[in-house]
Curated annotation (Swiss-Prot):
GO terms for cellular component: membrane. It is a single-pass membrane protein. It is found in: Membrane. This is Putative uncharacterized protein YMR141W-A. Keywords: Membrane, Transmembrane, Transmembrane helix. The lineage of its organism: Eukaryota, Fungi, Dikarya, Ascomycota, Saccharomycotina. It comes from Saccharomyces cerevisiae (strain ATCC 204508 / S288c) (Baker's yeast). Completely overlaps RPL13B. Its main location: membrane.
Length: 74
């Protein structure tokens, strides 16, 4: 549960409103497990996608929600 702190500020909609705040995600990078780092990379990619396309793909939000539920129930 402690490692969920890494994901607490990764809500995609929040990142989409403040793209440059994504840089602070790396502060907790070393505390995250490998599977959580993959989520970080997905969400950072989504951030840059939004800057170019002005939208975050809905399937990324779905993937994030599903994986977050898995972490909460593991």
């Amino acid at each position: 549960m402690h490692n969920l702190h890494c994901l607490a500020m990764l809500i995609p909609l929040n990142i989409s409103r403040h793209p440059f705040s994504a840089t602070r995600l790396f502060i907790n990078w070393s505390k995250c497990q490998l599977s959580q780092r993959m989520i970080l990379l997905i969400l950072i990619f989504a951030t840059f996608q939004r800057q170019r396309d002005l939208i975050i793909p809905r399937f990324l939000l779905l993937i994030y929600s599903v994986i977050q539920c898995l972490f909460l129930h593991s």
